[in-house]
Amino acid sequence: MTRTVPDRVTDVGNDLTRVAGSFLHSATTGDWTACGFCALPVDGYSLCPQCLSHRRTGLPLADRAGFLVYADEPSSQTYRMMRGYKEPRTRDTFEPIVEALLAVGLRGHFTCANKLAGTNDSGWTVVPSTRGRTVFVDLVRSLSTAPDSEIAVSHVGPKPDRVLNPASWAIAAGETLPTHVVVVDDAWVSGASAQSLAVTLKQAGVSEVSILSVARVLSPRWDENKPFVKDVLPTLSYDWTICPWTLGDCP
């Protein structure tokens, strides 16, 4: 981090490190090759197959994506957290950690997205739950310093499942769209849901879209993840000052 953040963000980041730093791993860069868009470990490619397939559609995609932590499925504590914060039985355990991660990402690094987009004319929205859950959107709303800047979006079509489907989402009638929208999502697996919403926003006239995901999920079904999860991930500590957009210093 190369800029000053509010003291409250610093307090939250330090508390988060103390409480959950033993199992959280910051998304960052290092001496491995990662997809230039979604931070997935790759071998000799600039984009992972999923992001490449998105690009080949010719649809107007998000301009950037940011990630706070890695979550390797199926049994890591971070992966359990990203599933458990939505469940009544485990919510009390995991929701405060997800909330703290969001606080760091939104209050500490929202302005980084604005800087990369080249504008302060920004709004935000949340990828709607296809199951009607409101846990995540409620967390984001509680942390927003600009509630009037929310772009209301609803789920109206089939869930995007690895394939982009901008018809899955609808922007509320009468919304005044800003130049730049930050799309907030809890977890990036294939990126299809968040990217589909980015397409919807761009087709409606938004110039710049930034996607902020709390967790970049690493699947054991992708071979390149296996050595990364085994050898690299355990060496990555949690550092709340890492910018989710650059995976390094703030822009």
List the predicted regions and their residue ranges.
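Glycine-rich phosphate-binding loops at beta-strand->alpha-helix junctions
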Residues: V126-F136
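N-terminal alpha-helical interaction blocks
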Residues: M1-L16
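Residue-level signal for inorganic ion chemistry
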Residues: S122-T125, V209
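PRPP/pyrophosphate-binding module of the type I phosphoribosyltransferase fold
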Residues: S154-P251
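Short, aromatic/basic amphipathic alpha-helical patches
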Residues: V135-A146
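Active-site-facing substrate-recognition patch
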Residues: D11, R18-H25, D31-G123, A146-L177, ...
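Conserved strand-to-helix beginnings and helix N-cap segments that scaffold or border functional pockets
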Residues: E95, F136-V137, A194-Q195
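Acidic beta-strand-to-loop metal/phosphate-binding motif
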Residues: W124-V127, V182
